[in-house]
Amino acid sequence: MEGLPLAKANVEAVVRIQTWLEASIRAHQTVGVETVLSTDKYRRLVTEAKQRQFAVRLFFVMLNSPDLNVQRVRLRVEKGGHDVPEESIRKRWNRSLAQLPWFLDQSDQAAIYDNSGAVPRLVGRKQNGATVVDPDAPLAFREALGLLAGPDRK
């Protein structure tokens, strides 16, 4: 995609990876996808993989707040990495958590990590159909899974 304007190159890259993923699943080849999970575009892919008897494994790495996401992107930019507008970071953080329950439900195994501290911490997992969540997992994660109710939502 050399020589293309950045926006056009990004679109071309998305089309190519989607085509490759679909072909890989049809050929029953193992695939892995990294995404911020801020859209539902991979739902169809997961559904097709499940229909073709793939085991679906989810590794979800989160931060405990959109503010921390903004800070991490600023640090990345300071080190020469790419920038993302703050508004986009905040929207994606919320949409990612909104998408999580569906993908967790579809997964055969899952591990959810809170990467807010110096060391990532396992805060949830799914195995053999059972999902276990650390009671000290970030509030937003527990809310996304509908684990909080009543006036004492801590």
Question: What does each model-identified segment do?
Answer:
Residues 33-43, 63:
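Acidic, metal-coordinating catalytic cores used for nucleic-acid/nucleotide bond scission
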Residues 22-26, 48-53:
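Conserved catalytic network of the ASCE P-loop NTPase/AAA+ motor domain
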Residues 102-154:
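NTP-dependent small-molecule kinase module
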Residues 1-29:
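Conserved substrate/cofactor phosphate-moiety recognition/catalytic segment
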Residues 13, 17, 41-42, 96:
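Amphipathic coiled-coil/heptad-repeat helices and related helical stalk/stem segments
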